Amino acid sequence: PDETLHKLVFGGYNRKVEHPRTEFDWLTRDARIVDAYIAHPMCGFTETTGLLRDLMTGIRYIEKPESLAAMRKELPVFFIAGGDDPVGNYGKGVRQSADAFRKAGMADVSVHIYPLCRHEILNEINREEVYGDILQWLSSHMKKSSPST
């Protein structure tokens, strides 16, 4: 584990959180979830340099035009993110990814940015809304792909 690299990668994530209680408040506004994350022995560790290298390698791979070009164009894609998520650059990165998918010829790309939500939108205080939107999107796309009767 490399503490310096960890601080460089994750150190600024709480920067826009008003009055953070912990170093992990950027994850969600739900304090119970943050506390459970901190208490869990498999969470909150300092990652190895190799893990970060592999993560960056994967991100670079999926961002390549040839990787996007190889995707099945007829598959629908639903990007969801928190508007206060530092990992997704506060919604900007998610919108850029959606634009890249569209430019690659993906026919059905939807984006929903949840204002005030942080990184773990499925663990946010409005998680029911998020799950409801996912269910609605899935239902509408299942209807589109159902065989005609």
Where are these regions (language model features)?
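Conserved alpha/beta-hydrolase "acid-adjacent" motif
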Residues: P86-Q96
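Acidic beta-to-alpha connecting loop that harbors the catalytic carboxylate
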Residues: G83-P86, C117-R118
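Short beta-strand/loop motif that positions the catalytic acidic residue
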Residues: F79-A81
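Short, proline-enriched alpha-helix->beta-strand connector loops that line the catalytic pocket
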Residues: M71-V77, A104-A107
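Alpha-helical elements of Rossmann-like donor-binding domains used by nucleotide-donor carbohydrate transfer enzymes
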Residues: A36, D54-T57, Q96, E129, ...
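Alpha/beta-hydrolase-fold enzymes
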Residues: P1-M42
